[in-house]
């Protein structure tokens, strides 16, 4: 990976990470479907993970890659819990639109 990083350059990884993060922010702010919002959050997390891997490779340190491994495990658990909640909400309400979720009362 070090050779590829030297050939491509860390600036391109930073640019790609920023673009992915902005796409995720756009999806969170402007979409009304809960599944699309979850996917956008995952895109944002993957953008940060890409940046961690690029910086850890650039500095020849494996701590960033280890952190990404644990971050991906937590993200997988987050998706499992989030989708289970969405399935439960869909069974009760019949919709997963964020506008319809505002009517839920605790």
From Swiss-Prot:
InterPro entries: NADH_UbQ_OxRdtase_chain4L/K, NUOK/Mnh_C1-like. Its EC number is 7.1.1.-. It is found in: Cell inner membrane. This is NADH-quinone oxidoreductase subunit K. It holds the Pfam family Oxidored_q2. NDH-1 is composed of 14 different subunits. Subunits NuoA, H, J, K, L, M, N constitute the membrane sector of the complex. HAMAP family: NDH1_NuoK. GO terms for molecular function: NADH:ubiquinone reductase (non-electrogenic) activity; quinone binding. It is a multi-pass membrane protein. GO terms for cellular component: NADH dehydrogenase complex; plasma membrane. It comes from Flavobacterium johnsoniae (strain ATCC 17061 / DSM 2064 / JCM 8514 / BCRC 14874 / CCUG 350202 / NBRC 14942 / NCIMB 11054 / UW101) (Cytophaga johnsonae). The keyword Transport applies. It is an enzyme of class 7 (translocase). One of its GO terms (biological process) is ATP synthesis coupled electron transport. Keywords: Cell inner membrane, Cell membrane, Membrane, NAD, Quinone, Translocase, Transmembrane, Transmembrane helix, Transport. Belongs to the complex I subunit 4L family. It catalyses: a quinone + NADH + 5 H(+)(in) = a quinol + NAD(+) + 4 H(+)(out). The chain crosses the membrane at residues 8-28, 35-55, 66-86.
